[in-house]
Design a protein with these regions (language model features):
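Short, glycine/polar-rich helix-capping loops at beta-to-alpha or helix-loop-helix junctions
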Residues: 104, 182-190, 207, 264-269
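Glycine-rich beta-strand-centered segment in the early N-terminal region that forms part
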Residues: 32-50, 58-102
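Short amphipathic alpha-helix with an adjacent loop that forms part of the alpha/beta core around
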Residues: 206-216
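Mid-domain Rossmann-like dinucleotide-binding core that forms the NAD(H)/NADP(H) cofactor-binding site
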Residues: 127-205
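Short glycine-centered segments of the SAM/dcSAM-binding site in methyltransferase folds
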Residues: 95, 152, 176, 242-243, ...
């Protein structure tokens, strides 16, 4: 993310959205580059990750984290470079993982940083395949889903960073993996490049029937990222004692009220009861022991080196 000399560009939350965010939701501001005080470091953002959870942080509602306040910098995880340091343990040129959000420069006392060293290889990976999205996939699938060889795993949003990683780990664990994505190009990528056994286009008029045909033995694990009609299509296919890690419900994030159509609440709860389904929502920051992250880094590093996990980034230059 290139900076403007002597200017700190900040994207702030200017208005809470009602439904889809629009041009009034965020505002670009220009301010002075902050000066670090005693015990502080000055950070320059190099990479910013844009993730679905940010939509929820725009709402003034009870959640796992405080909402972004009006006028505050929009939240986000970044890889940043230390430009000045008055903080022990951080030197000029260190790269760090920080939560400083949508801005060119930020100050930190170091307590919220993870030092990646002077010259980390592929620094942007710490926002993706070696960071929060892939760790979400790893922990949710292995700790909640507990996949066993021969089971069928269905992954919503299979072409995204979380879903793509879930499916590849499930294949490593010996499962049949069926992805769900939006469009034939995404589905082709999921099967041809990521190695899923099948991928269904949720935009197809025959989606529910196609999903049923792709899961002849039913569904043992459904990794939920989407909600909505995808969830409703999976429900009748769940086997007894199926597991459903709930990572997100992105199709509902921009709703300002209840979704249109029939009330599926009774069907959802009835299926959970009859089929004895384990449904567990989780937030990656506080749902698992800290030691699990070390296991993730060890395993993912090995899978990347062996080629068992493949990773594709989309990088956009500029704020």
């Amino acid at each position: 993310m290139p900076q403007t000399a002597d200017t700190n560009r900040r994207v702030v939350l200017s208005e809470r959205p009602n439904g889809l965010p629009d041009a009034k939701t965020l505002q670009l501001e220009h301010g002075e580059v902050p000066t670090p005080g005693a015990g502080q470091v000055l950070l320059r953002t190099r990479y910013l990750s844009l993730d679905p959870y940010m939509r929820g942080r725009m709402n003034d509602a009870k959640s796992y984290a405080e909402p972004v306040k009006l006028g505050e910098v929009m939240t986000g995880q970044v890889v940043a470079e230390v430009l000045q340091s008055n903080c022990e343990g951080y030197a000029l040129g260190d790269h760090v993982l920080a939560g400083s959000g949508w801005q060119d420069y930020a100050l930190s006392d170091g307590t919220d940083l993870r030092n990646l060293g002077q010259t980390p290889q592929n620094p942007s990976w710490y926002l993706g395949i070696l960071g929060m999205p892939a760790y979400t996939a790893y922990a949710g699938l292995l700790e909640i889903g507990a996949p066993q060889p021969g089971e069928t795993v269905v992954v919503a949003a299979a072409s995204g960073p979380v879903g793509a990683t879930v499916g590849q780990i499930a294949k490593i664990k010996g499962c049949r993996v069926v992805g769900i994505a939006g469009g034939p190009e995404k589905c082709a990528h999921v099967v041809e490049n990521l190695g899923f056994d099948a991928c269904l286009n949720h935009k197809s008029e025959t989606f529910a029937a196609d999903l049923k045909a792709a899961c002849p033995q039913g569904v043992d694990i459904y990794f939920e990222n989407v909600g909505g009609k995808v969830l409703y299509a999976v429900l009748p296919l769940l086997n007894a004692f199926a597991r459903m890690p709930v990572c997100g419900v992105v199709s509902w994030y921009n709703l300002s009220g209840l979704p249109d159509g029939p009330d599926f609440g009774p069907a959802i709860m009835g299926t959970i009861l009859r089929m004895k389904v384990k449904v567990q929502g989780f937030i990656i920051y506080d749902s698992f022991p800290p030691s699990l992250f070390k296991d993730f880094i060890r395993d993912m590093t090995g899978w990347l080196k062996s080629g068992e996990v493949k990773y594709k980034e989309q990088l956009i230059d500029g704020l």
